[in-house]
Amino acid sequence: MKMTENELIENHQRYLERVALYGEFGYDIEKERSFIIEKARPFSGNILEAGTGKGYFTLALAEAGFNFFSFDISAAEQRYALLNLMYYGLQQQVTFSLADVENIPCDDGFFDVIFAVNMIHHLSSVRTACNEFIRILSPSGKIIISDFSTEGLAVIDKIHECEGRKHELMSGTINEAKKVFIERGFNIREHKSIMQDMLVAGRIAV
């Protein structure tokens, strides 16, 4: 996929403008992403980011020094993510693919760590997605689910409104994910920041 220098610069400028806009509403993107990574530690092995989006968490994970896989259903969204990585020279750390979270093309037990950040609220079937995560998780691996808190969603709604858009929500919640993991016998550890609700789930103590 060829990118021009102008594309890199323009995309990065849009990224900085969005970070600044979030900051105006009290949402520190970099701080929230760092919170998720720190609460997920320690982790290593085969790492998956489920739901690339525009790549805000992708960038944070790459900047933290990790090599990982990332999939999304949208090639257009992944292009934004790749442009941002290329701006910082981090594109070699991420292997992108297109996939549906309800039918992930991956062997059973392949991933040691699975991140799903700010994705659950876009899902209509959290149970199906979580069961897919469990299927592709290694026996000693862990799944990290993080999504906007009530306060975070309120901020995101305001930001979308400022941009003349509407933040589309499906029915998925982090509590639904927690219920599935408990039913499957997983151990759960929970964390919360002002803007994020987060859980870490694993078959062994997490």
What are these regions (language model features)?
Residues 1-43, 87-88:
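Conserved class I S-adenosyl-L-methionine
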Residues 2, 12, 18-26, 144-201:
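C-terminal alpha-helical "lid/dimerization" subdomain adjacent to the S-adenosyl-L-methionine
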Residues 48, 54-103:
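Class I SAM-dependent methyltransferase SAM/SAH-binding core
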Residues 68, 143-144:
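A short hydrophobic/small-residue beta-strand
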Residues 102-113:
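A short acidic, Gly/Pro-enriched loop at the edge of an enzyme's catalytic core
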Residues 113-124:
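A short SAM/SAH-binding and catalytic strip from SAM-dependent methyltransferases
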Residues 124-128, 153:
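Short N-terminal helix/helix-N-cap motif within the alpha/beta-hydrolase-1
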Residues 127-139:
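A short glycine-rich, Lys/Arg-flanked "PGG" loop and its adjoining helix->strand segment in the class I
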